[in-house]
Amino acid sequence: VICVKIDKPRQIVLRLDDDDDSTLSVFADALETDIPDPNGEKTVLIDAGSCEPINGGDYPSGTLFYVTPGFHDVPRLLLMSNQQLYIAPGAVLNSRVRVDECQENVKIFGRGILRDYNDTRAFNSNTDERFYYLLTLGNSWDEGKICRNVEVKDIILLDPTSFSIVFLGAQDCLVDNVKVIAGEISTDGFSFWGNTKRITITNSYLHVTDN
């Protein structure tokens, strides 16, 4: 029995039996203060029946995608300007998520888990060539196609089979209190490519096999 006593929000990892691959991760977050309304006018619920890809371009500006508790398969999820993705506590979203090029003011948050939909490093028929990684912010090497002002907060990224979080032409972004746990080879934690600038990362934890 392992008992952990915590008197404030903390991220604690216990290394067991002197083995880097045997760890117990304890993520004790503060209480949520920014829980969105699941019944909001522009809220789209992702529930147990969700199994199709989601293209934010099919939804209006201001849409909130609300992932309810439970396990949900959404092979790929594309976010556009002024959209939000909320992953509730107890929710596991099996997906790959991208904020598209030229988009801005996007928020990804919640206390749930984003887990890689791909079960191998190779791409499968449920992804396309633009969803290479678990979470991608931006999608262009072109300086004129920058993704801006994206916030990623509080979520857990689990079991990526490729790079974990990739910034590809992203600027003025914030990553706060994000936890990444990976065991696959070459699951880089943060990758900064293209014209990526002014990225702030705070209070975050990485257990990956690179970077």
Language-model region placement:
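Extracellular/periplasmic carbohydrate-active domains that bind, remodel
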Residues: 1-211
